[in-house]
Amino acid sequence: MCTLMHKHDDSLFSNSFGFLRLPLEFYPYTRHNDWVITGVPFDIATSGRSGSRFGPASIRKASINLAWENCRWPWNFDIRQKLKIIDCGDLIYKSGNVQDFTNILQKHIENLLRFRKKILLLGGDHYITLPVLRAYSKFFGTISIIHFDAHADYYDNNNQYDHGAVILYALHEKLINPNRSVQIGIRTEYDKNFGFTVLDAEYVNTTAVHVLINQIVSVIQNRPVYLTFDIDCLDPSVAPGTGTPVIGGLTTSCALQIIRGFQKLNIIGIDIVEVAPVYDCAQITALAAATLGLEMLYTQVKF
């Protein structure tokens, strides 16, 4: 199989086709493009149910359902005519070697940023965000994040590699500024003393979308912001295919409406994580992830 940089791949979960039927381009760094999609099939840092290593392939497969539209509703243009987007396939790493994976992912992101690419990552568990933020810090310094999740992800389990501690590690390394960052959809234990603006799930589900968007924009302003979307932010009724589901989450409609309010934000990168298709039903979780990813790209078209 052809793979990123034509490295040998003996995994059983890598993709064979691109997101939204985009052609696979295995030398993404010097290509003339705006956005690069990379699959990150990694779930060794999962504390609950594993299986998100199959997330990238499932999201790409579900994205076929979206490829037929010239103009994704409610937008009035074809994103493929406005943004130069390529899919470079899946990251290749030594199976079972977390440090090898961490180094390879960080280097891949650094190479893309060196050539001024913007990045959409398809995970994989939420640990993948940490090496990505390390790479971004070398180019942007301390940045803001918008973090969609059911969990705050700063739980200290004394484990160097833990998807539930990615935000904690990012804070310790000063990769992100919590006072200029927003967490959305949280509905498990969190500590207000960390400094994040937290729009918990109950608040989001009972507040007008325009109010939520105004709050988010007022915190982020024009700062460089990284958008990380854990699919368990959504309610399990619409996204059952994930490792640590929590009831009382966002609907897909609510998430889409919030994301559409990000058009004026300075988004420098995106990831969508924790899709575990083995627990999915009729591909609805993968379809939600694919649709949200496409919607995020639409918001990045500047007129």
Curated annotation (Swiss-Prot):
Residues passing through the membrane, by range: none
PROSITE patterns, per the entry: ARGINASE_1 (PS01053), ARGINASE_2 (PS51409)
Keywords: Hydrolase, Manganese, Metal-binding, Polyamine biosynthesis, Putrescine biosynthesis, Spermidine biosynthesis
Required cofactor names: Mn(2+)
MF GO annotations: agmatinase activity; manganese ion binding
Pfam families named among the record's database cross-references: Arginase (PF00491)
Keyword Repeat: no
Sequence positions that bind Mn(2+): 126, 149, 151, 153, 230, 232
Any Gene Ontology biological process: putrescine biosynthetic process from arginine, via agmatine
Record-listed E.C. numbers: 3.5.3.11
InterPro entries for the chain: Agmatinase, Agmatinase-rel, Ureohydrolase, Ureohydrolase_dom_sf, Ureohydrolase_Mn_BS
Reactions catalysed: agmatine + H2O = urea + putrescine
HAMAP family linked: SpeB (MF_01418)
Family statement drawn from the similarity comment of this UniProt entry: Belongs to the arginase family. Agmatinase subfamily.
Known role: Catalyzes the formation of putrescine from agmatine.
Protein name as it appears in the record: Agmatinase
Organism: Blochmanniella floridana
Protein encoded by which gene: speB
